[in-house]
Amino acid sequence: MAQKYDVMVIGPVSVDYNIDYLGNERREIGGAVVASGFAAAGSGARTAIFCKLNEKDADVEERFRGVQADVYWKASSATCSIRNQYFTADKEKRQCTSLGVCDPFRFEELPQMETAVYHFAGLVYGDFDGALFEEASRHGKV
């Protein structure tokens, strides 16, 4: 019997360099796919996560350790990477610089399984295109 999911969260893993207003820098592995994936799984929804990254930059198993979801991933020539320079303690003002972009997502590379909702958790222009959204909408809610 094929797997069935309430939601599939799709997006790039990101290597983020976050610099606070005092100049302290933290390297963090995250991105919208990580935050949304943990949130969806934590809600009790049957969750699949599909992400892309270059495996030399981050360990998928380590980053998603403890998530109550099935995690799928595909190698990318590059990993999404963002530098955030914050100028205030409340982090309301920042400069955001793209340092790397993963390969675009295509519907045919997603795990082929029944999914009620496709949640696209992108970070930069080019992660997704209209053809991906159109095809996903034929298979579930977008």
Residues of each region from the PLM?
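Extreme N-terminal starter segment of soluble prokaryotic enzymes
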Residues: 2-8
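Conserved N-terminal subdomain of the carbohydrate kinase-like
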Residues: 4, 15-27, 42-121, 126, ...
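Active-site metal-binding loops of divalent metal-dependent hydrolases
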Residues: 11-13
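Short catalytic helix/loop segments, enriched in acidic residues and glycine
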Residues: 25-38
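Active-site proximal beta-strand in glycosyltransferases
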Residues: 140-142
